[in-house]
Amino acid sequence: MSIRPLYDKVVVKRIEAQRTTASGIVIPDTASEKPEQGEVIATGNGRRLQDGTQVPLEVKVGDQVLFGKYAGQTVKLHGEELLVLREEDILGVVEASDAKLKKVA
């Protein structure tokens, strides 16, 4: 069973935040906040305007996105916590630059 969002809805899987600091201190689950970044795993067909035309979504499956702390609705599917939100609740798409993708020697 999978989820298929409707209209301008987007399903996002949160990307887990790092649980240790640079100095090696482990941050417990109770002290850490939910991450505000995730990967789009499903999208709707787009927003329907009053005249009946459909506007396609800007985001696509696989995009890494940023969203507000209180954005969307949390749902559980197969024991996995997902976030369903409107495209307008997405603050931006994280784009990987070539510099980050290159292996540092």
From Swiss-Prot:
Gene3D superfamilies named among the record's database cross-references: GroES chaperonin
Highest taxon in the source lineage: Bacteria
Pfam families found in the cross-reference section: Cpn10 (PF00166)
Cystines in this chain: none
Subcellular location: Cytoplasm
CDD domains registered for this protein in UniProt: cpn10
One example of a Gene Ontology biological process annotation: chaperone cofactor-dependent protein refolding
Any one annotated GO CC term: cytoplasm
Keyword vocabulary terms for this entry: Chaperone, Cytoplasm
Recorded GO MF terms: ATP binding; metal ion binding; protein folding chaperone; protein-folding chaperone binding; unfolded protein binding
Role this protein plays: Together with the chaperonin GroEL, plays an essential role in assisting protein folding. The GroEL-GroES system forms a nano-cage that allows encapsulation of the non-native substrate proteins and provides a physical environment optimized to promote and accelerate protein folding. GroES binds to the apical surface of the GroEL ring, thereby capping the opening of the GroEL channel.
Subunit-level organization: Heptamer of 7 subunits arranged in a ring. Interacts with the chaperonin GroEL.
Similarity-based family: Belongs to the GroES chaperonin family.
Name assigned to this protein: Co-chaperonin GroES
Organism: Methylovorus sp. (strain SS1 / DSM 11726)
Name of encoding gene: groES
